[in-house]
Amino acid sequence: MRCFVFSLLTTIVLSSCSHKNEAIELTRSFFTSLSDSTYGSPTDFYPQYDSLQIEAKSDVVDIEESDITVKNDSIIVRCMNNYTDAKGTFKQDSVVIFITKDKDSEWYIYNSRGLITIDKDIEWFGKKTGALGKKPMNDLQLAEVLGKLYSLMRKKYWEQYIELKTQVEILDWSWETSYDGTAHGEARIKNKLPYSVSGIKYQVTYYDRQHNYMAEDDGSVSKTLNPEEKYNFTFWSSNAKYPSRARLTLEFSDRGVYDLLKAKYYTGTEFQEYIKKGKKQDKRTKEI
């Protein structure tokens, strides 16, 4: 009986070691494929990799056998992915790889955690709107959430941008040409919003007598406009000689729009409300 038990334990240990070795090989193969296309496609090892909608990078992956957990036909590999990003900065990410067997008893990666890196703005927005919590998500689930979160953020971005375009207005402006043909002028603008606005930019587009485009010039309004405040600024353009017509427009930087989004109050239920609204719209579309 003791011999049987010992033999059984030995078999289990050997099987576990074998599975760990297979998991290490599979994981290394996957990370190698991220930087070496001749080695294979990432989807050869991680069938749903394309669903993550990322281009992960890897130079070296560090795997310790002690960081591998085997449970029946599932294996969890915790590793460190070392790489240099597009900006030339060295990165080291903690990644978890989830492995199981397919119907042919072949090992494959069915999920991961840590391959997706989140932009700071979208991470902040996700936490404020209730899309991202404190508990980290696995990558496949995170990719699905991020797709919807980006849509919500674009919606909020354009709402904010349109509000700026319509409520920070040009009250009056004029321009003329100097003796050398260069154009210069002045404008008066007003902030009709209940909050301060900074980072206002302007663009002047010049045309000839046939309304053909000649050139454009841009600049920034150096002042932060408080609610209901009016402000005059001047501009000088040297890249259009003797224009006949001109058009002045106000623009707002992405950073300025995002800063205003960050200043808003959020209940933490915006993401779920957006999802519910989307489902209702889909249902109505199907009923038509």
Language-model features: locations:
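Short, well-ordered beta-strand segments enriched in hydrophobic/aromatic residues
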Residues: 183-191
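Low-complexity, intrinsically disordered terminal/linker segments enriched in charged
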Residues: 31, 109-167, 223-227, 265-288
